[in-house]
């Protein structure tokens, strides 16, 4: 990531990638990919029958009965969101903050993007009253809001929106005639799935919600791009599905055949892969809790992470200490922490937050070690936080944040 100076750049800003697992590829998945390496024929646009059928089963296990005629696959969720945005037309609404890859695709199409505030307790889903106010303001100014993108388990905040908030926001969006894209990329990474209620907007508003899931979250390695979309099961959904396929065809956006073979297998969730996925989530939950403790113990603010492989920290309380290091905004903070921590630390401006706010996303994957052997050991260890390489990485984080806390205390005026 580089400083986003205006000179030499267009209006589109590309943000950091999804937080990776930091773990080696499961041998079972690698075997399916290699077995399909000699397939010369291109996959169908929208996905092969095997991928589509597996996607239907994936959603049905999550309570969403799905018609194969309303499913599409693409090489990553960004391609699907680009096609959906182009097919639906109009202006786009997103929460603030939001995933770094949402807004650039609307801007690439020349579509205005409007950020809507989220409640203090969670990210990913806009406050319903702020949503209504934004929609009415945009329309009063001559805009045409048509699409709301939201997420239940959120990047960058790592939080899960409560069902009552989701209900109110979905009702508000429905009342304004918005189509919803529910990014459910992180739904399978909940730290406490038994204690966290997660409902899809598609269960509440079947005719106006398209679900998008990037398989890089829990099912495939980040370097094997594949994603699936579930369209509304009615005439409008069928028409939208057809338009999206047209756009994917124009883009040549097909899933590579070996990746498609691995995706079709992963979507069936065989026991070995399901167990590996559960162990991965448990590992990142433990590391995220330790990372959160290090951050808040130094005086920064961060919601306790509930999903994903990341947390979102507000270093506003340490602004005075950071100013002593030349840090005045989120870009400065990104560069400072990336250098000090030795791992990417994208600033909040990458996620649509105010540049002046000292916010940053911190990922857990880079804390798992520097080699495949070290990272694999994290999965099998009964005490991964005590492994030397993990302990060193967390100690570095604690040291950096503790130094900032100490600097802030030295700068406090006498009482």
Give residue spans per PLM region.
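Helix C-cap/helix->beta junction micro-motif
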Residues: 109, 175-176, 298
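Conserved core segment of the aminotransferase class I/II
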Residues: 211-281, 295
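Conserved glycine-rich beta-strand-loop-beta hairpin in the small C-terminal domain of fold type I
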Residues: 281-292, 296, 301-321
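PLP-dependent enzyme catalytic core of the Aspartate aminotransferase-like
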Residues: 65, 336-345, 351-415
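N-terminal small-domain helix-loop-helix segment of the aminotransferase-like
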Residues: 1-76, 83, 269, 368-371, ...
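Conserved core of the PLP fold type I
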Residues: 39-172, 188-203, 384-386, 390-391
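Short beta-strand
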Residues: 11-13, 212, 254, 301-306, ...
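Short, flexible/disordered intra-domain loops and linkers
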Residues: 121-126, 159-160, 190-196, 239, ...
């Amino acid at each position: 990531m580089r400083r986003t100076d205006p000179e030499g750049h267009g209006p589109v800003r590309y943000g950091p990638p999804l937080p990776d697992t930091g773990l080696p590829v499961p041998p079972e998945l690698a075997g399916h990919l290699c077995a399909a390496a000699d397939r010369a024929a291109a996959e169908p646009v929208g996905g092969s029958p095997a991928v589509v059928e597996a996607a239907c089963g994936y959603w049905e296990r999550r309570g969403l009965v799905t018609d194969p005629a309303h499913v599409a696959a693409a090489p990553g969720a960004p391609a699907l969101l680009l096609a959906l945005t182009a097919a639906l037309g109009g202006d786009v609404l997103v929460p603030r903050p939001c995933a770094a890859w949402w807004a650039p695709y609307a801007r690439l199409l020349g579509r205005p993007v409007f950020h809507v505030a989220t409640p203090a307790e969670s990210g990913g889903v806009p406050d319903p009253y702020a949503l209504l106010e934004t929609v009415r303001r945009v329309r009063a100014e001559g805009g045409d809001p048509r699409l709301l993108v939201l997420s239940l388990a959120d990047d960058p905040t790592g939080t899960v929106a409560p069902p009552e908030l989701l209900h109110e926001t979905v009702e508000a969006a429905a009342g304004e005639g918005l189509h919803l894209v529910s990014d459910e990329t992180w739904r399978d990474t909940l730290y406490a799935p038994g204690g966290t209620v997660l409902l899809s907007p598609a269960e509440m508003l079947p005719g106006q919600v398209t679900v998008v899931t990037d398989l890089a979250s829990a099912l495939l390695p980040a370097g094997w791009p594949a994603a699936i979309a579930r369209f509304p099961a009615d005439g409008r959904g069928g028409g939208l599905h057809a338009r999206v396929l047209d756009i994917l065809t124009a883009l040549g956006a097909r899933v590579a055949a070996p990746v498609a073979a691995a995706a079709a297998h992963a979507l069936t969730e065989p026991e070995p892969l399901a167990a590996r996925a559960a162990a991965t989530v448990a590992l990142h939950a433990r590391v995220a809790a330790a990372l959160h403790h290090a951050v808040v113990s130094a005086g920064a603010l961060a919601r306790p992470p509930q999903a994903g492989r990341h947390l979102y920290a507000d270093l506003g309380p340490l602004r005075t200490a950071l100013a002593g290091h030349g840090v005045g905004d989120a870009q400065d903070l990104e560069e400072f922490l990336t250098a000090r921590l030795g791992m990417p630390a994208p600033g909040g401006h990458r996620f649509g937050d105010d540049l002046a706010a000292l916010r940053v996303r911190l990922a857990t994957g880079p804390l798992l070690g520097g080699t495949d052997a070290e990272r694999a050991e994290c999965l099998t260890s009964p005490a991964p936080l005590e492994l030397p390489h993990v302990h060193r990485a967390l100690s570095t984080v604690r040291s950096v944040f503790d130094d900032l806390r100490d600097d802030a205390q030295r700068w406090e005026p006498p009482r």
